[in-house]
Amino acid sequence: MSDQDNTQTSSSKLAPHHNIFMANLESSPTKDRNTSSQNASSSRVIESLHDQIDMLTKTNLQLTTQSQNLLSKLELAQSKESKLLENLNLLKNENENLNSIFERKNKKLKELEKDYSELSNRYNEQKEKMDQLSKLAKKSSAIEQSCSEKLQNMEVNYNSLLESQNLYRDHYSDEISKLNEKIGLLELELSNQNLNYGSDTSSNSDIELNLNKFNDSVKDLKSLETEKDSKLSKIITHSLDELNLQSWLNLYQTNENLISTFAEKMDLKDVLKRNDEKISNKGAVVQTLKKNVQTQVESNNADALSSNNAQDMLPIKMVKLRKTPNTNDSSSNGNSSNNKRRSFYTASPLLSSGSIPKSASPVLPGVKRTASVRKPSSSSSKTNVTHNNDPSTSPTISVPPGVTRTVSSTHKKKRNSMVVHGAQS
């Protein structure tokens, strides 16, 4: 349909030109060639002109044919151009669609890249966690092996302990049964012996009297100690009153001078004022030093008294003695059996004989018999030399043999240190 339309348009365009060309051909002078023979000279010129005209007509026809061909080609080119334009529009639409699709794909690709980066980070984190967990698993496996070995060892030890405990239980149960049998026999023997023993209580009464005497002597010793400590404290206070503190004051003065020189070098005005005030109040400084020494002496005496009282408080208990059996009784089983029973119940053979020997002294059992020796302290020798030898200051009392008077070492050290310090000053 498009080719027919192109041919119609080309024929409609060429029609007026063709009519003009044919009119020119009809009005050409070639028709009057026979009639116009009059002018011979001009005929040649006319013929040449006619030849030229023929040539021009031929060329014109050729040009028309060429123009028709060109028009047909132009129409074909136009049709192709229209087709190409249509194709171009279609391709543009397709290109736009492809661009939109491409943008969508790019967005999706970016999102996928983000997801990939996040997943890669998570993967790395999970990998690190897996490495840590693998290390922990290795450590836990090693610990588990060691614990399993320890558990096995503990099981073996536990089993061995159970076996040994069972063996010990059986052994000691047998021994306990034997001891119960022996105790029953001994109870029967003791019941028989108690029936045969008399009521001799003279030894117990003697021991009670001796204990009462000992308690009275201990009370007297405590009172003497308190009196002596009070006298010593008076002597120490008197010596402190007469004590010369000039060396301490000299040392204090040198320290104050050093502080004042240092303050002058460092431009410390407050320190200089304080030092001037302290130097002006020498009497107050001496009084404070005496008060400090007295408080220290009093505290030392209190500590010594408390330590002496704690050491002197000894527990005294009554010793129960067994009654002596009758040797002439027929129910006794002999001297050897009686001695064994007495040793079993910790009774001494001297006390069980019925009377206390004259050489034995009324002393508690277990107390060592030593001579009461007291070391003279340096403080008493320096302050009052005749104090220990004076009967008025150190009254005597009869102390039972075997009891030693002890003076606490801390009290001696504190008194000695105070008196020596005063002598040095």
Swiss-Prot record:
GO terms for biological process: endoplasmic reticulum inheritance; mRNA transport. GO terms for molecular function: RNA binding. The keyword Membrane applies. It is found in: Endoplasmic reticulum membrane. Residues 68-197 form a coiled coil. Residues 326-338 have a biased composition (Low complexity). InterPro entries: She3 (IPR031398). This is SWI5-dependent HO expression protein 3. It comes from Saccharomyces cerevisiae (strain AWRI1631).
